Amino acid sequence: MSERRDRVHPYVPEMQEQLRQGRVSRREFLRVATLLGVSLPVANLLAACGAAPPAAAPAAAPAAAPAPGATAVPAAASGAVTRGGVLKVGIQVPAVDHPARFSWVFDSNEFRQVYEYLTETGADNITRPYLLEKWEVNDTLDLWTLTLRQGIKWSNGDELTSEDVLFNFKEWLTPETKSSILGLWEGFLTVDNVTAVDTYTVQLKLDAPKLDVPETLFHYPAQIMHRSFNGDLTTLTNPGTGPMKLDAFVVGERVTVSKRDGYWQDGSDGSPLPYLDGIEYLDLGNDQTAYVAALQAGQIDTIYDPTVDTFLALRNDAALTVEPIATSQVRVLRMRVDQEPWTDVKVRNALKKIQNRESILEKAYFGQGVLGHDMHVSPVHPEYAPMEVPAYDPEGAKALLTEAGVQQPLDVAISVGTGWTDIVAYIETLAEDGKAGGFNITLDTMPNASYWEKWTETPVGVTPWTHRPLAVMVLPLAYIADKDGVPMPWNESRWVDEEFSTLLKQAQGTLDIEARRAIMKDLQAIQQTRGSIAVAWWQSVWNIYHPRFQNLSAHPTHYHLWREVWLDPSKAT
């Protein structure tokens, strides 16, 4: 009887040759090969050996222990994994209802141990199957076959099936849901082209080629809900596939989750995960100093997304672990192009010209980052095309305002959340430097929670945007419209450019990294010269926690992938 051979995408050997020639890096090879369905172990082998790739299994989830993408400390290094304990997290707790409408990463983190994803992009920016066992894609990247792991049980005892996956795609792709996920699929997929092949297999028939489908499935609002989902994940009644169950949700106060029985993955000790008894997410308000004090006092064990002030306060604390994370996280100063005077590109570009980027980075973020170029593609993105950093040019700004017929100084109020102290310092610096460029800038300050409520509505504001592993993931979220010309839900500036949208769709279906980078060069130039955003710098970020908790590993998007976190009693205090 012949051994079954699974199909390998024909671009994989071509890219392997590019790797051999030094045209792509090993990391770039691994990221693309795994997106095309090659399992990570096989992709590593191909990267190392340099021979023509053999027939290999498609991307497949590892055995139940350890979990996919886990970053567990080997038992030999830590003595032995122990069970028990409660992890306490300092994090704000806003109102939420439907996961597809999550606007912020911390929304998803507070439910991430209860509801899971079809795929998982690890701290290495490589995407692996999760609730999926594998995926396969055809030569032209427009037919994706998703195969679920069999035997995964919801907390109510039901089995995870294609019916659940179809339910979620319908939720995501229905405009009435108002999900940012819709922007990632716009022009590629409609709900009619999502079909169940059998109980465990779903096919996506796309209208155009798309490379980043597996990463799109890990967009943080894409938590998989049971087919009976009641529309409000805070009601404590919705089944989950995760290792914990939701016990309490109180806006502005806390979220508590606890270990459940029967989780589908085992730990290194052979028993079902998780190791912890539970996690408490505690809202300590808008002031980061409260979180610093609580961490130092042992009242919490880690802080979600610590600010640069928090980093500076804690970086030399010997009782804590401080880990830097390479990321594309950024503060985006955006102008609504559907409101005057921002309908005029000259006025938008004038605002960009009053950014003294070196001064902003030093004053707002104490030099902990790299300078930006007024476009939303980061140097950490593999398709980034290097650009010259724009200079501070107040005279050029005044000239543009004069050309636009704008009376000077131009009064501008910029909305900022005061809990983001670096954003406040950014706009304070901009206000001072902008005087010479014909601007009178004031800060419209509010608590972060208030900014979250109006972040897509305020005329001018600074919005924190989190890390995405590819630029072709973030750009369609914020800078395109639907087929009727209506800006997508997260297009907070309402900027839509036909040439930009056409090139972006081309980039999303381009396999060759060099070719994609060439397209990205044009996209970056378009956004820099006629776009709606200013990007002064890209942030360094940190993971800060008490080392008594093991496997509390850093993730560039601050995702809490914590199913294997455990409390080391030898380090407990």
Question: What is each PLM-predicted segment?
Answer:
Residues 182-227, 248-250:
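Surface-exposed binding/hinge segments that line
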Residues 244, 370-403, 418-425:
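Structural transition elements
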Residues 122-126, 217-280, 289, 395, ...:
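Gly/Pro-rich hinge or "lid" segments in bacterial periplasmic/extracellular proteins
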Residues 90-139, 170, 239:
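N-terminal lobe/hinge region of extracytoplasmic solute-binding protein
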Residues 53, 89, 251, 294-300, ...:
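Ligand/substrate-recognition segments at binding pockets and active sites
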Residues 263-313, 440-442:
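Ligand-site clamp/hinge motif
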